[in-house]
Amino acid sequence: MDQSKRYVNLGLREADLIKGGRHVLCAYRMRPRPGHGYVETAAHFAAESSTGTNVEVCTTDDFTRGVDALVYEVDEAEGLMKIAYPVELFDRNIIDGKAMIASFLTLTVGNNQGMSDVENAKMEDFYVPPDFLTLFDGPARNIAHMWKVLGRPEVNGGMVVGTIIKPKLGLRPKPFADACHQFWLGGDFIKNDEPQGNQVFAPFKDTMRLVADSMRRAQDETGQAKLFSANITADDPAEMIARGQFILDTFGENASHVAFLVDGFVAGPTAVTTCRRNFPDTFLHYHRAGHGAITSRQSKRGYSVLVHMKMARLLGASGIHTGTMGYGKMEGAPDEKVVAYMLERPTAEGPHYRQDWGDMRACTPIISGGMNALRLPGFFDNLGHSNVIQTSGGGAFGHKDGPVAGALSLRQAHEAWMRGISLVEYAQGHPELRGAFESFASDADRLYPGWRDRLRIAA
């Protein structure tokens, strides 16, 4: 059934839709299956995403037609279609009238992902109008609150030096806590790796008690505040709340030094919102493990990394992993810095829409995945600043002189970049950074040709 007369209006102007403020706009790359027209398939897509189905139904009235999702732009050659969704379509909480990402996903990338006439469709960007934007929780905390705990300026406080305890699984409570203590002697921040929780060989409560003790000892020994991000992810919100409360009680006077890690992609919006609403005074660390199945550039379905990041900010993530933009081991490219800008800026330009975030607090980019001291300057050059949480697992624990030296090498690389000094030159007076060149020699050869001669290190 051709539904284009009802669900397509190519006379609508995007500028007018934005000015009107009553539509969420979504841009997709869509390809119909052979034998199906582009506009007709786009119309069916919009119908299935809003008020329609594959046949006309007798219960449809004029009000229903007034909230149809409408295809307002198509470029068949580029495979681009844009759809305007009236804000009235989206579900809202009965307890407080707030909007929900679950409803946004259900409409915009729900049944339309399995339609028989659609070969593939991937959302590349979306726009939220100002009034509707205020119905999302947004972040309660961000990197500024970490800087405050660390005693830094709350504006442009610089990189938070972090790590992930490795191996990601297999450490019992004491070795895990000992590794935390060692890193904290040189670094700022430690996170649970995403699968770490309450394994039989590492009971959650035993581990957290020992980590809290390691934090106290490291702070006493260094005179500096330390930070820990604890994984509270679970299927059951009650379990998440129980874990979170136990951690706050266990860390006691250092409760403000704790973040809560939530595996937001695999556990979903409910898990993120459970943390955001039950622990608004705690940094909400959104880990995106699993997202590549949907967001990868190789995938032609689902949604993009940018869409994922924008949803995380709406949900209330204090910080989210953004990848390393091609400078680490994970898939990515330098032009993905727009992802970080969309998280941290009050207004940012996406591939299709300019999003004004109004008064919504910024979300912090968390950088991880194959980073070490030698890779940081190039990353910061590309991003244009260093106001990120950076977590290096192998980059710290793979240092030839151990995790303390690894942490210090990361800090020294940041110092060199901030001062505009070449890394090789800075390494001449900083043994930990010099050790990073030896520890990650293949990176050194690629990024800093001639480093061995300048540092007088034999091959």
Swiss-Prot record:
Q: What is its EC number?
A: 4.1.1.39
Catalyzed reaction equations: 2 (2R)-3-phosphoglycerate + 2 H(+) = D-ribulose 1,5-bisphosphate + CO2 + H2O; D-ribulose 1,5-bisphosphate + O2 = 2-phosphoglycolate + (2R)-3-phosphoglycerate + 2 H(+)
List of residues binding Mg(2+) = 191, 193-194
Q: Which InterPro entries has this protein been placed in?
A: RuBisCO, RuBisCo_large_chain_AS, RuBisCO_lsu_C, RuBisCO_lsu_C_sf, RuBisCO_lsu_fd_N, RuBisCO_lsu_N_sf, RuBisCO_lsuII
Q: Which cofactor names does the annotation list?
A: Mg(2+)
Q: How is the cofactor bound?
A: Binds 1 Mg(2+) ion per subunit.
Annotated site residue numbers, Transition state stabilizer: 329
Task: Specify the superkingdom.
Answer: Bacteria
Keywords (alphabetical) are: Calvin cycle, Carbon dioxide fixation, Lyase, Magnesium, Metal-binding, Monooxygenase, Oxidoreductase
Answer whether the UniProt record assigns the keyword Transferase to this protein: no
Q: Which GO annotations describe the biological process of this protein?
A: reductive pentose-phosphate cycle
Identify the Pfam families for this entry: RuBisCO_large, RuBisCO_large_N
User: Quick one: which residues bind substrate?
Assistant: 111, 168, 288, 321, 368
Residue numbers of N6-carboxylysine PTMs: 191
Give this protein's Gene Ontology molecular function annotations.
magnesium ion binding; monooxygenase activity; ribulose-bisphosphate carboxylase activity
> Which cysteines are cross-linked by disulfides?
none
Top EC class, one word:
lyase
Looking up CDD domains in the UniProt record yields: RuBisCO_large_II
What is annotated as the active site? 166, 287
**UniProt record similarity statement:** Belongs to the RuBisCO large chain family. Type II subfamily.
The annotated subunit structure for this chain is:
Homodimer.
- Give the misc comment: The basic functional RuBisCO is composed of a large chain homodimer in a 'head-to-tail' conformation. In contrast to form I RuBisCO, the form II RuBisCO are composed solely of large subunits.
- What exactly does this protein do? RuBisCO catalyzes two reactions: the carboxylation of D-ribulose 1,5-bisphosphate, the primary event in carbon dioxide fixation, as well as the oxidative fragmentation of the pentose substrate. Both reactions occur simultaneously and in competition at the same active site.
Identify this protein by name: Ribulose bisphosphate carboxylase
